[in-house]
C-alpha cells in the first residue's frame, strides 16, 4: 500500500515540468523519493534515515548518540536547548498542543503573499505544478479567479510564496518542536471565501497526522500565519486543547448536505463537548504552531470578505515513512493514488519504483 503524502505526490508527478530534480533510490526501510528545487539547491541529505523534504538551510549535524540524548527530556512535545520557547510557553504547548505567537510578522510583509495569490488565482502568473484548488460551491462560476480559488498548495514551486517557509523567524520557532534539521512537508496558502449559504467553507474537525504517512508525530509541527484578521465571523481556527495527547482517530468525509471540499476529511462520529473547544482569533502576522494530533478545524466564513492564511508543516529529518495498509490512513492513501493517476504518475506504491 502507498506510503505517500499529497504534496510529495504532486511534487513527484510534476517534477519534470517544474524544474525539480527527482531521485528515487532504495534504502533499507522502503523505497523513498527525494526531491530538491534545483534552482535553489536546497540540500537533501541523510538518506540513511529515509526522509523526504527540503531541509532548513542552516544545518546542525549531530551524531546519532547526540540526537538521542537531545530527545531525552522531561518534556515530550518540545526539545531542549537553542529554542525561543520560554518556560511558560513550553509548558503551554506541552499541555495544550498549540502555541500562538503574536506579531511574528509585520502585517505589511504579508501583503506580498496576498498579492502573489491574486496573481496566480487570476491567471496573471503561471506556476507549473502548483496545486490550485477551488471551493466546491464556487468552482463552476463563470470567472475562476480569486473569488473561486480557496487554496494553493506546493508553495515550494513558487519563489515568492516559498519565502514564508524558509523565513528564519518561522524556522527558529519550528526548531523548538522538530529540531534543527527540518523538512517542509506540506505547504498551503488558504483563501477561505465568504460562504454561499451551504456552509461548504467549513473545515471539519480533523488531525493533520491523518494526511502524513511518517513518524514520529511528536517531531512534526504546523506553522499557520494569519495574513488577514481572523475571527469567529470569518471562520477562525477552532481547536480542542490537549487532544494532541490522544491517538490518531479514524477520518472520513462528513455527510454535509451541500457537499464537502476535496480531501476535507473529518474525524468519524466525533462528539467532543463544545465547551472544550477554543477559538483562535488572530491579527495579521500572528502565528500559531500546533501538533499534528491536535484536533482542529474551522467554521464557515459568515463575513463578506476573504480570510487568508499561509502555512507550512515541518518535520524532523529523522522521520521515517510507515506503511498505512490496514490503518485508518488507508482511505487518504487511496485518494492520493487516484490524484497521482490523474496527474500522470503511473504507480500505485512507492515500492514499485524501487524495481
Predicted regions and their residues:
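Short helix-to-loop capping/linker segments positioned immediately adjacent to catalytic or ligand/cofactor-binding
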Residues: 159, 173, 209-213, 226-228, ...
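Short, conserved beta-strand element in jelly-roll/cupin
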Residues: 213-232, 281-284, 289, 313-317
Amino acid at each position: 500500500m502507498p506510503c505517500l503524502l499529497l504534496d510529495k505526490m504532486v511534487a513527484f508527478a510534476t517534477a519534470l515540468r517544474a524544474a525539480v530534480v527527482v531521485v528515487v533510490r532504495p534504502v533499507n526501510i522502503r523505497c523513498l523519493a527525494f526531491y530538491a528545487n534545483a534552482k535553489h539547491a536546497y540540500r537533501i541529505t541523510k538518506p540513511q534515515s529515509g526522509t523526504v523534504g527540503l531541509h532548513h538551510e542552516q544545518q546542525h549535524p549531530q551524531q546519532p548518540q547526540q540526537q538521542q540524548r537531545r530527545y531525552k527530556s522531561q518534556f515530550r512535545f518540545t526539545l531542549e536547548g537553542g529554542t525561543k520557547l520560554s518556560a511558560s510557553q513550553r509548558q503551554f504547548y506541552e499541555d495544550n498542543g498549540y502555541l500562538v505567537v503574536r506579531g511574528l510578522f509585520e502585517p505589511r510583509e504579508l501583503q506580498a503573499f496576498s498579492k502573489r495569490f491574486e496573481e496566480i488565482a487570476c491567471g496573471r502568473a503561471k506556476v507549473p505544478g502548483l496545486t490550485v484548488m477551488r471551493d466546491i460551491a464556487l468552482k463552476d462560476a463563470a470567472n475562476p479567479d480569486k473569488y473561486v480559488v480557496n487554496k494553493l498548495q506546493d508553495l515550494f514551486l513558487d519563489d515568492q510564496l516559498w519565502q514564508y517557509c524558509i523565513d528564519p523567524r518561522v524556522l527558529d520557532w519550528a526548531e523548538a518542536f522538530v529540531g534543527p534539521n527540518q523538512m517542509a512537508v506540506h505547504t498551503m496558502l488558504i483563501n477561505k471565501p465568504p460562504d454561499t449559504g451551504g456552509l461548504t467553507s467549513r473545515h471539519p474537525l480533523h488531525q493533520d497526522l491523518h494526511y502524513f504517512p511518517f513518524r514520529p508525530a511528536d517531531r512534526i509541527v504546523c506553522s499557520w500565519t494569519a495574513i488577514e484578521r481572523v475571527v469567529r465571523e470569518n471562520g477562525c481556527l477552532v481547536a480542542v486543547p490537549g487532544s494532541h495527547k490522544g491517538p490518531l482517530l479514524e477520518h472520513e468525509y462528513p455527510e454535509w448536505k451541500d457537499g464537502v471540499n476535496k480531501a476535507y476529511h473529518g474525524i468519524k462520529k466525533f462528539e467532543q463537548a463544545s465547551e472544550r473547544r477554543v477559538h483562535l482569533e488572530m491579527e495579521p502576522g500572528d502565528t500559531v504552531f500546533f501538533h499534528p494530533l491536535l484536533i482542529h478545524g474551522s467554521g464557515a466564513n459568515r463575513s463578506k470578505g476573504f480570510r487568508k492564511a499561509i502555512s507550512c508543516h515541518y518535520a524532523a529529518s529523522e522521520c521515517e515513512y510507515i506503511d498505512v495498509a490496514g490503518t485508518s490512513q488507508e482511505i487518504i492513501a487511496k485518494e492520493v493514488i487516484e490524484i497521482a493517476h490523474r496527474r500522470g504518475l503511473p504507480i500505485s506504491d512507492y515500492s514499485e519504483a524501487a524495481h
